[in-house]
């Protein structure tokens, strides 16, 4: 991680630059895959699964037998954790549900507003080196609360043609209607256009690599709505001398291991804490299963020492991080002054 001490405000813009991605060269390849999926349906999707995920599939749909098998394979401790997470996510999002309102704008004129769940939604859950069952819950639980009648999930299988059991169990717990073994651009195309197996949906949600992001943006031009364009994941931690350096380092690494293009930033008023966090990051990094990914993303990351908390807040509002963690003595006061955070620049 790069260490920056007392940067001048005029240098903040340069200092806070995010890792850039040139996706212009991807459009031709992504467009060709989407066109093939639109024209040839399941056949094209399975061909791309063989090409990119190195698996020969007989069908795309996850069967009820596979769901039962997955449930039996998930350890009881993980089941308990998934159920607890589902309950917490449900409780939080249930409170957000819009019940509608009526307003009489003038005598005899009443306007009203109501929220209706999208009938069919598609959820994309990436594969890779770690099963993102938390993503399943965070996408599917709100969809269920909103009243979506059909929740379709696509996720890439492994080389044996299996989806990770934890993903299937989380999907079952969250109320997903149908699950398909498809990843990447071909999965986005299948949900956007519909195939013999995969239903056409009205809106697609979920993270993915740069190919998935380009595919989502391309299908959004004509076929289907999407949540939003997304970039690499990021987190900023604001901390003072009262913060626990082990916790701060763990918070930074938890985001750094998302991908090699992730970015993590510590902004602190304490040089002692900065140095302790720098040590802890290296100490904890060595014990991470995904240490190589985290180590690469730390090349994009920064430890920044500022003169006071007002400067920390100003820098934060200019950076507008996707995720922000405040670890200070007066955390509520600091949080109240942050106006630009939770801006989904990342996935």
PLM regions and their residue ranges:
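N-terminal Rossmann-like NAD(P)+-binding subdomain of aldehyde/semialdehyde dehydrogenases
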Residues: 1-119
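Short acidic-hydrophobic, aromatic-tinged amphipathic segments that line or gate anion-handling sites
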Residues: 1-7, 178-183, 303-308
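Conserved NAD(P)+-binding/catalytic subdomain of aldehyde/semialdehyde dehydrogenases
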Residues: 175-263
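Short loop-to-beta-strand entry elements in the cores of soluble alpha/beta enzymes
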Residues: 205-207, 228-239, 254-278, 294-304, ...
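C-terminal core of ALDH-fold dehydrogenases
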Residues: 318-347
């Amino acid at each position: 991680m790069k260490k920056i001490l007392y940067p001048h405000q005029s240098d903040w813009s340069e200092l806070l630059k995010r890792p850039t991605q040139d996706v212009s060269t991807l459009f031709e390849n992504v467009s060709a895959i989407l066109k093939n999926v639109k024209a040839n349906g399941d056949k094209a999707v399975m061909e791309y699964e063989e090409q990119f995920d190195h698996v020969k599939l007989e069908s795309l749909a996850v069967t009820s037998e596979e769901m039962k098998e997955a449930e039996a394979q998930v350890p009881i401790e993980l089941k308990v954790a998934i159920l607890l997470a589902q309950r917490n996510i449900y409780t939080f999002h249930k409170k957000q549900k819009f019940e509608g309102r009526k307003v009489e704008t003038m005598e005899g004129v009443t306007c009203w507003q109501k929220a209706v769940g999208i009938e069919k939604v598609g959820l994309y859950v990436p594969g890779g080196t770690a099963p993102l069952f938390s993503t399943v819950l965070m996408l599917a639980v709100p969809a269920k609360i909103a009243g979506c009648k059909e929740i379709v999930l696509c996720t890439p299988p492994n080389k044996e043609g299996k989806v990770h059991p934890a993903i299937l169990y989380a999907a079952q717990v969250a109320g997903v209607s149908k699950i398909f073994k498809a990843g990447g651009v071909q999965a986005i195309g299948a949900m956007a256009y519909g195939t013999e197996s995969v239903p056409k949906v009205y809106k697609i949600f979920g993270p993915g690599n740069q190919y998935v992001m380009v595919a989502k943006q391309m299908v959004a031009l004509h076929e289907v709505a999407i949540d939003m364009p997304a970039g690499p994941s990021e987190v900023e931690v604001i901390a003072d001398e009262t913060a626990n350096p082990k916790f701060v380092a763990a918070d930074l690494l938890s985001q750094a291991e998302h991908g090699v293009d992730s970015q993590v930033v510590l902004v602190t008023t304490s040089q002692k804490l900065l140095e302790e966090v720098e040590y802890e990051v290296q100490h904890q990094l060595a014990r991470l299963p995904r240490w190589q990914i985290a180590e690469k993303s730390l090349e994009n990351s920064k430890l920044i020492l500022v003169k006071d908390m007002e400067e920390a807040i100003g820098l934060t509002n200019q950076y507008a991080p996707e995720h922000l963690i405040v670890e200070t003595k007066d955390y509520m006061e600091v949080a109240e002054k942050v106006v630009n955070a939770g801006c989904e620049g990342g996935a």
